[in-house]
Amino acid sequence: MDGPVKLVSRVREDIATARAHDPASRSALEIFVAYSGVHAVWGHRVAHALWRRGFRLVARVLSQLNRFLTGIEIHPGATIGRRFFIDHGMGVVIGETAVLGDDVMLYHGVTLGGKARRGAGRGTKRHPTLEDGVTVGAGAKILGDITIGTGSTVGANAVVTHDAPPHSLVVGVPAQFRPLADATADAARGVHD
């Protein structure tokens, strides 16, 4: 009985997360039937469970079906925490060894991509880690085995190839970071780079 109860609890949590992040949502029913980001996460959970149990081909086929239906590609090997939300998710790509903590939010067009290292074999971590509470703006590309620290924000269209410490604002091409508190204070004062 624990399985179905846990499943219903997670679905409710996902819907509540979508409502909290999207002020345009009108109802839980609307989210349940019409939010592709939520559907992609649900499909990933099934594919990831199959992947972990060794049903790799079935998991990959399911992930490609999920991609076809939602426009969001999440490799079944990716590890994703709770309360993950993808807003307007078309074009999101999450690679095989990506790790996402709890309360992560991605906008459309985000790529969590790999960088192959010469001589690295199968199973080598080559995709980013996003710690808890990270938000990634539309079109951002985070590439390679790097870590974006807890509570950080990655700006739209940033190209990130280096680690960012917790509570950073990460912007630009190539991306630079600074403490999020400093960036927030500058914005309040009307100071721009």
Task: Please name every model-derived segment.
Residues 1-70, 183-193:
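Terminal amphipathic alpha-helical/low-complexity segments used for targeting or macromolecular assembly
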Residues 46, 120-121:
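Short glycine-enriched, charge-decorated loop/helix-capping segments at active-site entrances
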Residues 29, 33, 64-65, 98, ...:
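Residue-level signal for alpha-helical context at structural boundaries
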Residues 70, 75-76, 81-82, 87-96, ...:
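Left-handed beta-helix
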